[in-house]
């Protein structure tokens, strides 16, 4: 029984031919989406740069200058907060680590704003272990 069904299936396939009908996929959108292909990670044979670039933002470049206005002094005295002008490209994490590196104090959090003149101002709230007034005296802007 098996050989005859196999033979009849082969006969049917031979009559049908190899170029059968292919079901066409109906496109419902006019935009063609490129299929996602395999993207291998790069493994370069040699470095393209002979020497890596120096650190563009170190602690001394991040903190530009302390701000010693009356409102900033009020923040120092009452809010345990230091106020600095910082580099426009620096972020809060970089500012926090720069203050730790330069002045050996831990910051609780950092608030930043960009002033109308295009510079960035940072309010660095210190932890209760440190006194902002002492740090400001040590820095020399009081």
Swiss-Prot record:
List locations, semicolon-separated.
Answer: Cytoplasm
- Biological processes, Gene Ontology terms: translation
Query: Which InterPro entries did the record assign?
Result: Nucleotide-bd_a/b_plait_sf, Ribosomal_uL23-like, Ribosomal_uL23/eL15/eS24_sf, Ribosomal_uL23_CS, Ribosomal_uL23_N
Q: Cross-referenced Pfam families, in alphabetical order?
A: Ribosomal_L23 (PF00276), Ribosomal_L23eN (PF03939)
Name any one GO molecular function.
Answer: structural constituent of ribosome
UniProt keywords (A-Z) are:
Cytoplasm, Ribonucleoprotein, Ribosomal protein, RNA-binding, rRNA-binding
Which Gene Ontology cellular component terms are annotated? cytosolic large ribosomal subunit
Primary location class: cytoplasm
Q: How does it assemble?
A: Component of the large ribosomal subunit. Mature ribosomes consist of a small (40S) and a large (60S) subunit. The 40S subunit contains about 32 different proteins and 1 molecule of RNA (18S). The 60S subunit contains 45 different proteins and 3 molecules of RNA (25S, 5.8S and 5S).
PANTHER family (alphabetical): 60S RIBOSOMAL PROTEIN L23A
Q: Which family does it belong to?
A: Belongs to the universal ribosomal protein uL23 family.
Q: What does this protein do?
A: Component of the ribosome, a large ribonucleoprotein complex responsible for the synthesis of proteins in the cell. The small ribosomal subunit (SSU) binds messenger RNAs (mRNAs) and translates the encoded message by selecting cognate aminoacyl-transfer RNA (tRNA) molecules. The large subunit (LSU) contains the ribosomal catalytic site termed the peptidyl transferase center (PTC), which catalyzes the formation of peptide bonds, thereby polymerizing the amino acids delivered by tRNAs into a polypeptide chain.
The protein here is known as: Large ribosomal subunit protein uL23
Q: Please give the organism.
A: Candida albicans (strain SC5314 / ATCC MYA-2876) (Yeast)
């Amino acid at each position: 029984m098996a050989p005859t069904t196999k033979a009849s299936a082969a006969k049917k396939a031979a009559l049908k031919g190899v170029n059968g009908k292919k079901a066409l996929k109906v496109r419902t959108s006019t935009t063609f989406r490129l299929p996602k292909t395999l993207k291998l990670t790069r493994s370069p044979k040699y470095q393209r740069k002979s020497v890596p670039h120096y650190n563009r933002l170190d602690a001394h470049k991040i903190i530009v200058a302390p701000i010693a206005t009356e409102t900033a002094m009020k923040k120092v005295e009452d809010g345990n907060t230091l106020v600095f002008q910082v580099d426009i490209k620096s972020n809060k994490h970089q500012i926090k680590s720069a203050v730790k590196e330069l002045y050996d104090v831990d910051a609780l959090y950092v608030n930043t704003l960009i002033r109308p003149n295009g510079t960035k101002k940072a309010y660095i709230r210190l932890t209760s272990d440190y006194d902002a007034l002492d740090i400001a005296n040590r820095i020399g802007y009081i």
